């Protein structure tokens, strides 16, 4: 296995390990969710709020908000501390991976770890949508503000609609019949999971990229690596295998809960052997240089159609397009998904050939 393949395989294995680490951080939120549950039940266990005059109600809502702030602030502090540790770990891991790939004769530099942490906080999130461009600390703080407002707003709305304390608590906690999955606190829990998974992806990617930049005499650019299974998003399917300069271009996470990663593309002096490594997919190991649509072409027709839809599946199989051509047809220059009509305008002959 040559140096480039070693790096690719190491990056993909690390991405799998990182998913386990994300789950561990998600699990830590259960403590804070329980504290919120206790806080709300305590504050709503007395007199019916519908009997409160406005000033008294606002005082109670302020008390609830301050309690939420304290709980979520502790969660944010813990998450930020974990992210700092992850940044250091990922940067060090990539330096070791580079050293292993290129051999002891070539010196690999470890970036200054304080600079890595600064880069994590100064680099914008690449997620598409409203959170795109945010820095990581405001991204976490916005979650705290949003969830507090959601809960305080639900209490205020319940009072003005004449709901009893019990009904308001049920709206917040959910019902036992639905395993409490239908309450506002479950929304908070799911949003916390997304924040953790997305935030850690950003931290890990930025830390890796800083190591690559510190070794720009060895690393030429970065390559996008997407998870090879049926849950991979449209944007990540199309970005699979694309290469970007060290100092520009899109980076994971491309969306909430993104599982993609980047791997270093070595300078030509280190990539002198043919590729032959392997990476993991949902149905076993495959070639390390296989892109998402290369892999998808190897899957059963039913699976292809379930992932990308019947028409796109037909186009992939019968349109006469290579995997790279098909991938380029999925996104515009701003990495936004194209509709079938948009795709038809760009490649009308492929649609004719596929009979669409």
Predicted segments with their positions:
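N-terminal leader/targeting and assembly helices and adjacent pre-domain segments
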Residues: 1-178, 272-356
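Acidic, glycine-rich two-metal-ion catalytic cores of nucleic acid-processing enzymes
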Residues: 169, 179-277
């Amino acid at each position: 296995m040559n140096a480039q393949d070693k790096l690719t395989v190491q990056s993909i294995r690390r991405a799998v390990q990182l998913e386990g680490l994300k789950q561990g951080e998600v699990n830590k939120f259960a403590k804070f969710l329980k504290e919120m549950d206790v806080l709300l039940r305590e504050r709503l266990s007395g007199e019916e709020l519908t009997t409160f005059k406005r000033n008294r109600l606002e005082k109670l809502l302020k008390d609830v908000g301050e309690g939420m702030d304290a709980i979520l602030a502790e969660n944010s502090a813990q998450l930020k501390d974990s992210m700092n540790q992850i940044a250091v770990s990922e940067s060090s891991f990539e330096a070791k991976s580079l050293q292993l790939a290129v051999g002891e004769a070539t010196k690999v530099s470890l970036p200054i770890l304080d600079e890595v942490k600064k880069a994590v906080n100064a680099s914008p999130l690449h997620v598409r949508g409203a959170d795109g461009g945010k820095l990581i600390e405001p991204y976490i703080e916005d979650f705290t503000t949003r969830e507090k407002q959601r809960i305080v707003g639900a209490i205020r709305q319940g009072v003005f609609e004449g709901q009893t304390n019990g009904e308001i608590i049920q709206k917040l906690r959910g019902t036992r019949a639905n395993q409490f999955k239908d309450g506002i606190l479950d929304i908070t829990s799911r949003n916390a999971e997304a924040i953790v998974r997305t935030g850690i992806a950003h931290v890990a990617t930025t830390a890796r990229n800083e190591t690559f930049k510190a070794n720009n005499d060895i690393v030429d650019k970065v390559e996008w690596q997407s998870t090879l299974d049926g849950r991979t998003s449209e944007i990540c399917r199309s970005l699979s295998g694309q290469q970007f300069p060290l100092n520009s271009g899109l980076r994971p996470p491309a969306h909430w809960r993104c599982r993609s990663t980047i791997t270093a593309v070595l300078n030509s002096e280190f990539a002198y052997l043919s590729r032959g490594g392997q990476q993991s997919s949902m149905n076993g190991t495959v070639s390390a240089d296989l892109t998402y649509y290369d892999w998808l072409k190897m899957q059963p027709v039913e699976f292809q159609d379930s992932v990308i839809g019947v028409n796109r599946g037909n186009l992939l199989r019968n349109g006469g397009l290579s995997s790279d051509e098909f991938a380029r047809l999925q996104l515009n220059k701003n990495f936004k998904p194209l509709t079938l009509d948009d795709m038809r305008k760009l490649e009308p002959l492929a649609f004719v050939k596929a009979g669409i």
